[in-house]
């Protein structure tokens, strides 16, 4: 353990917080657990080999003691995470109060860089007007903690900063008692879900982030953005450049439980949350604006609103703003009632607003009147925040994307063709498919007939598109704007979706020209698909019909890039380089056809699924690939870590905006040496494929990781694998990466790198020099190495060897693990060599410190997991062993702070 890293004076408060929480947890353990468990946990905190200690102690523990020890280790990881989060916020505030300027990734610093880069106000305004940044919340099942447990953690996080402000022993004792009480509740709450989450559960979890965080964070962030820009560019106005999007309730790729009903449920929940927020803000505004016409002038349009008010109290006759607000609230709540939401309004209900824009227009009348008549401060406070909120959230709160596998779309098209007496669609070649689809897309005549009985699949798919059309009509055009084609491989995949949109009334054809209400978004996710992305899109851009469709959508084409499957296919190095090359090619292609590009990055939380710091990731994109337009998926434990707290949410969203603007306005960057990167990719790919195609590899993976137990964890509504667990390609990327995180190999994020560097540099010092230069100066290569460094710091080859002992074929496992161990040695050596350092994380003290705090408990959980997996494999029906495995999976995920 690198305990010396905690001796920095800047970390004194962190050390005190950690000690305070640990003492509370020990108080709890003394009351709730046996002395042997308490003593073991104390020994773990100073042990250099936690797993060995666990192996020694475990035979002395009964089932209850084993359970308590496992739970205690997981709780220690949780409370240390909380202490870390509080410390990050503390250091940020100290930094700001010291007036040291903005940190990297802040808008303050970005605006300074724009000015230093000679960007003038007009060019900045032009870029802002063409900027769209969206964080898209998905239901990918990587959040191992229950919402109940997360709520306990948030309560501790809110209380902990009070420790520094306690001025006497009594205050500290009261704080201690509050935290002890929460920890007791946490101890006595089940850590694991007993039942599988439903899609509706996932929807509710996603919605809960908004009142918890986003409703506060987004308006505040916009206010800060306006301030930062106006300090340097006084005439710049900040449009709605940042939004939150979602997939939860509309993503049916591999999830048979997503339906038209779940889509409708999602928007009802969205609307319920956002209208409750609006009602609360209008009520506060009503109390804030008792301005009297005896004291202020009021614009005529506000007086007109007041005249229509249902608030007829005598005391309000001289308070036109309050009366106008009552009118606005009654109309807004009238809309809520029209949408079927069961919420009341103290002023009754008036004619519903037809659109969020009407609601916005009335609020702006209040603002204009306040500014015109000397009340600017009131106009720029809560009212301005509410105006921004309505303009961002509308009546739908967040837009949802639709997503489905290309093959599922094709099956619906084939059945429509069959019943219409047309060609056997699935037997046609690609050229023929394009021809028949374009024929059917050249006119408005539908293929669907209400008098024909279609398969459940076809009815299910068309019902979702029809529901999306109704939702757009009711909640606003922005409620559903994207339909994503996963596993997109051919131009016909895009045209097939277009046909389904036409059949559902979401795409109209007039005089042969299409007009679509939804963006058609291809998702290229495998290595082969990424390499084929440009030919597919060039074929589309050459079609006059598709050109007209793009014109109806503002001449913007969104492309989604999948990080997960490409990594599983080819390893981290090859995946990263293929993605970069695909983006380079797409930039040139879009320029050639004068189409604006928006890239949607399907990244996970872990490096093996494209994760890593967002700021560096965006700046590492090829020049021209961002251009103000970017969407990024956020999922599972990442949503909790980044967005469950308003302060965290504000900073993480600010980072996305800052990086997007820097990458767009200051894109002066050199691409990496293509020949060098291709060579690195080719050799890395060769070694990675040698491993995963080894005949004994799949059995090794299934037996030496908790992959099969993860499938029973009830993390999400979607099945863990597409078919069976017999082939790597049938396994979803999330449990694939999740499992390698659990057994501490993190293999998808580095395997093949070391052999590639060694092969290329052997006898070739110029190549080593070139790679070192790239490591120092090229954003793409720097980001790749930085992510790899973070993962390798969490890798523990000794612990991983314990997992290898779970194999049912020791001789075969010895060969596979030998390959992995040797590649780890090479990759670590190569990484240190290119970074020109002797230790990992030398320049990332924050992560090194964080790991040092948690590693004793994390390693202990791994030791417990190996022992419990061994027991479970011998006794498959042992419920205690399965529960312990589940608890250790939870604990390890918390200790690592990312999963999949």
Swiss-Prot record:
Keywords: Carbon dioxide fixation, Lyase, Magnesium. InterPro entries: PEP_COase, PEP_COase_bac/pln-type, PEP_COase_Lys_AS, PEPCASE_His_AS, Pyrv/PenolPyrv_kinase-like_dom. Its cofactor is Mg(2+). The keyword Coiled coil does not apply. Forms oxaloacetate, a four-carbon dicarboxylic acid source for the tricarboxylic acid cycle. It comes from Neisseria meningitidis serogroup C / serotype 2a (strain ATCC 700532 / DSM 15464 / FAM18). The keyword Magnesium applies. It catalyses: oxaloacetate + phosphate = phosphoenolpyruvate + hydrogencarbonate. It holds the Pfam family PEPcase. This is Phosphoenolpyruvate carboxylase. Belongs to the PEPCase type 1 family. Its EC number is 4.1.1.31. GO terms for molecular function: magnesium ion binding; phosphoenolpyruvate carboxylase activity.
């Amino acid at each position: 353990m690198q305990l010396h890293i905690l001796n920095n004076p800047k970390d004194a408060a962190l050390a005190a917080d950690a000690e305070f929480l640990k003492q509370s947890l020990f108080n709890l353990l003394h009351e709730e657990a046996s002395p042997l468990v308490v003593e073991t946990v104390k020994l773990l905190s100073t042990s250099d080999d936690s797993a060995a200690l666990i192996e020694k102690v475990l035979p002395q523990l009964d089932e209850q003691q084993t359970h308590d020890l496992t739970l205690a280790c997981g709780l220690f990881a949780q409370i240390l995470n909380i202490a870390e989060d509080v410390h990050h916020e503390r250091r940020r505030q100290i930094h700001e109060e010291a007036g040291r300027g903005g940190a990297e990734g802040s808008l303050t610093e970005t605006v300074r860089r724009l000015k230093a880069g000679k960007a003038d106000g007009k060019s900045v305004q032009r870029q802002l007007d063409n900027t769209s940044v969206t964080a898209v919340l998905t239901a990918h099942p990587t959040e191992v903690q229950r919402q109940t447990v997360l709520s306990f953690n948030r309560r501790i996080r809110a209380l902990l900063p009070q420790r520094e402000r306690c001025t006497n022993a009594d205050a500290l004792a009261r704080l201690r008692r509050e935290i002890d009480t929460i920890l007791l509740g946490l101890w006595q709450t089940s850590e694991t879900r007993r039942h599988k989450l439903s899609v509706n559960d996932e929807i509710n979890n996603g919605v809960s982030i908004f009142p918890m965080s986003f409703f506060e964070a987004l308006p505040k962030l916009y206010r800060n953005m306006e301030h930062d820009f106006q300090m340097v560019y006084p005439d710049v106005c900040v449009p709605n450049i940042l939004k939150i999007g979602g997939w939860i309730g509309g993503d049916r790729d591999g999830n048979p439980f997503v339906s038209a009903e779940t889509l409708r449920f999602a928007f009802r929940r969205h609307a319920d949350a956002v209208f409750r927020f609006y009602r609360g803000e209008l009520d506060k505004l009503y109390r804030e604006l008792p301005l009297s016409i005896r004291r202020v002038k009021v614009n005529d349009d506000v007086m007109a609103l007041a005249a229509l008010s249902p608030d007829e109290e005598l005391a309000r006759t001289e308070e036109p703003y309050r009366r106008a607000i009552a009118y606005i609230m009654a109309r807004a709540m009238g809309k809520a009632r029209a949408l079927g939401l069961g919420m009341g309004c103290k002023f009754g209900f008036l004619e519903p607003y037809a659109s969020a824009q009407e609601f916005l227009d009335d609020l702006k009348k209040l603002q204009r009147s306040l500014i015109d008549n000397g009340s600017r401060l009131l106009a720029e406070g809560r009212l301005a925040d509410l105006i921004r909120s309505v303009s961002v959230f509308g009546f739908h709160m967040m837009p949802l994307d639709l997503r489905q596998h290309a093959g599922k779309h094709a099956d619906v098209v084939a059945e429509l063709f069959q019943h219409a007496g047309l060609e056997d669609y699935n037997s046609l070649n690609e050229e023929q498919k394009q021809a028949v689809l374009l024929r059917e897309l050249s006119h408005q005549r539908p293929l669907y007939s209400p008098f024909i009985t279609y398969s459940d699949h076809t009815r299910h798919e068309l019902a979702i598109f029809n529901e999306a059309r109704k939702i757009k009509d009711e909640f606003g055009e922005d409620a559903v704007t994207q339909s994503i084609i996963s596993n997109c491989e051919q131009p016909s995949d895009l045209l097939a979706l277009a046909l389904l949109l036409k059949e559902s009334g979401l795409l109209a054809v007039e005089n042969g020209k299409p007009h679509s209400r939804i963006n058609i978004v291809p998702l290229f996710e495998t290595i082969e698909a990424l390499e084929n992305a440009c030919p597919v899109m060039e074929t589309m851009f050459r079609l006059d019909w598709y050109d007209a469709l793009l014109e109806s959508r503002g001449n913007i084409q969104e492309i989604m890039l999948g990080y997960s499957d490409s990594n599983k296919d080819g390893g981290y190095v090859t995946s990263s380089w293929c993605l970069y090359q695909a983006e380079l090619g797409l930039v040139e292609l879009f320029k050639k056809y004068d189409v604006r590009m928006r890239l949607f990055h399907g990244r996970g939380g872990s490096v093996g699924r494209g994760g890593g710091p967002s700021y560096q990731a965006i700046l590492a994109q090829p020049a021209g690939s961002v251009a103000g337009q970017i969407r990024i998926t956020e999922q599972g434990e990442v949503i909790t870590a980044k967005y469950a707290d308003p302060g965290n949410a504000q900073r993480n969203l600010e980072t996305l905006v800052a990086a997007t603007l820097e990458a767009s306005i200051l894109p002066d960057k050199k691409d990496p040496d293509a020949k060098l990167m291709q060579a690195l990719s080719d050799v890395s790919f060769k070694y990675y494929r040698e491993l995963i195609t080894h005949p004994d590899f799949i059995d090794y993976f299934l037996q030496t990781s908790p992959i099969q137990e993860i499938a029973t964890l009830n993390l999400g509504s979607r099945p863990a694998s597409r078919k069976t667990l017999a082939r790597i390609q049938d396994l979803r990327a999330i449990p694939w990466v999740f499992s390698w995180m659990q057994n501490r190999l993190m293999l998808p994020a580095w395997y093949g790198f070391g052999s590639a560097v060694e092969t290329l540099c052997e006898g070739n010092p110029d190549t080593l020099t070139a790679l070192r230069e790239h490591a120092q100066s090229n954003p793409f290569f720097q980001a790749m190495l930085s992510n790899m460094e973070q993962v390798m710091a969490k890798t523990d080859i000794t612990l991983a060897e314990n997992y290898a002992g779970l194999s049912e074929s020791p001789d075969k496992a010895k060969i596979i693990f030998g390959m992995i161990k040797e590649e780890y040695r090479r990759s670590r050596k190569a990484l240190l060599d290119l970074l020109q350092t002797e230790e990992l994380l030398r320049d990332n003290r924050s992560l090194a410190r964080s790991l040092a705090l948690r590693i004793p408990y994390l390693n202990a959980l791994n030791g417990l997991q190996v022992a419990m997996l061994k027991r479970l494999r011998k006794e498959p029906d042992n419920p205690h062993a399965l529960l312990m495995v589940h608890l250790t999976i939870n604990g390890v995920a918390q200790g690592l702070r990312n999963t999949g």
